[in-house]
Amino acid sequence: MEGPGVHDPLLELFDQSNGVTTDSRQCGPGLLYIALKGERFDGNAFALEAIRKGCIAAVVDNPDVKGENLIHVPDGLDALQQLARSHRQRFQAPVFGLTGSNGKTTTKELIRAVIGQELKVHATQGNLNNHIGVPLTLLSIPVDTEFALIEMGANHQGEIAALCTIAEPTFGMITNVGLAHLEGFGGVEGVKKGKQELYRHLASKGGTAFVHAADPDLIALSNLEGLERLPYGTPNHPPHAWRSAGSVDAPIYWSVSAGAAPGPWHDGQGALEVHLHGAHQLANMQAAIAVGVHFGVSPGAINAALGAFLPVDQRGETVTTERNTVIVDCYNANPSSVESTLRAFASAGHEAPLAILGDMMELGSHAAHGHRMVRDVARECAVECWVVGHDFAAHAPGDRTFPDVNALRSALAEEGIEGRTILLKGSRSMRM
C-alpha cells in the first residue's frame, strides 16, 4: 500500500488499531469502535461497553456520552466515511467499482476468483455494499492488497455517486440496468441515471469502464467524454464467451480474437465446464473473463477459476434432497432477474419443473405490472408456477397461490412433492 501521507488524528488512531467495527457485539481488544445511529438503535449507548471490551477508543457523536478513550465528532457516519476515504487515498492499487440491477454479487465473486489467480484481491464481503458497508470494506483492505473490488448497491439516485466519492474507483463495471428498486429510483429512467453515476465518476477521473457490448443501454450510458471504454462480450468485442447449440448446460467456450473465426481459447484444456446456468450467468462470466484478460491473468488460470466456481449462498445454488432437486435463488428478486431466471430454468430440460415465486419488493407503482409480466413469462415458458405473497395474489395468481410462506410450507408438508426440480425465487424479505 502506497500513496501520499494523510495527517488525520482519527486515521492515526486507526493505524494503531486492529480494525474498525460499528457493531458493539463485535467489539474486542485493539478495535476502534465508531458509533452509528439507526432507526431502532443508537450506537452511542454502547460506547462505554466497547471500551470495557477492550476497544482502544470509541467515536461518538452524542456530547452527553462521557468517559475515557472517547472521541467526539459531529456525526459518526460522516466520520466513518471520511476515515475510509482517507485510508483509500493512501494506496495506489486498482480500485474496481461494481454495480448493476442484477448479478452484482455473482459477478463480483467471479472476478475475485479470476483476478485472485494472479493478484492479492480484497473484495466486498457479503452485502456490505451501502453507505456503511463500503467504508467498512475499504477500512478492512490489507496493506499488501493488489486489487480492491468494491460492490456498490443503491436504491435511490445519488447513492452511487456518494459511494464513488468515498471509494474513488479507477476501474468500474455496471452489470446491467433492469427493473430493480423502481420505487426508490422513480422508474426505469431513474435506475439508468442512478447506475450511470459510476460511469460519470470514472469519466471525471479519466478512469476505465468495462462495458458489455451486447447491452445497448450500457453502450449509451457509457458514451461520456473522458471515459475509457473497454467493450466486451460479442464476437466483435472480445473476450466473448458462448455455449454451443445455445444450451444452458452445454460447455462454455471463449475467445479473445476479434474478427477471426470463432474458436475456443481454452489453453489446451478442452471446453470449460462450469457450475452456473442461464444466459444471465453467461454474461457474468464474460465480465469476469474480460477483467481477467485485461489484468494479465492467463487463459489456463481463468479456466481454473471459473471451473471451480460455485454459486454463492442463495444465488442459484442447487440443493439435492431425498425427494427433489431445489435451485435456491432467494437472495433478491425483481422482474428482470426473475424473467431471466425463469427462461433459463425452462430451457434447461429439467424433469417435472416447478417454479415457486415470491413477491418482488420495492416496485412501488410498478408492482402490478411487474408481477403480471413475470407470470406471463412463466406461461410463455410453459412452467408450472406457484406464487407466494400479497402482490402475486392480487395481480398475478399462479397455478397455485399462497398468501405467505407459512401457507406454502403447510401445503408442502401435507401433500409432499417428489421427483421434481423446483426453482425457489423471491425477494429476501419473503423468507423463501
What do the predicted segments below correspond to?
Residues 1-82, 86, 346-352, 363, ...:
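N-terminal leader/targeting and accessory segments in enzymes
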Residues 2, 60-67, 173-325, 350-351, ...:
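Acidic, Mg2+-coordinating active-site environments of NTP-dependent enzymes
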Residues 2-4, 79-213, 217-227, 410-411, ...:
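Phosphate-binding loop of NTP-binding sites
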Residues 20-24, 39, 276-287, 310-316, ...:
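Short glycine/threonine-rich catalytic loop with a Thr-x-Gly-x-Asp
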Residues 47, 160, 195, 199, ...:
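Generic hydrophobic/aromatic pocket-lining and core-packing "Φ" positions
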Residues 99, 412-432:
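A glycine-rich beta-strand to alpha-helix segment
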Residues 191, 333-394:
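AMP-binding/adenylate-forming catalytic core of the ANL superfamily
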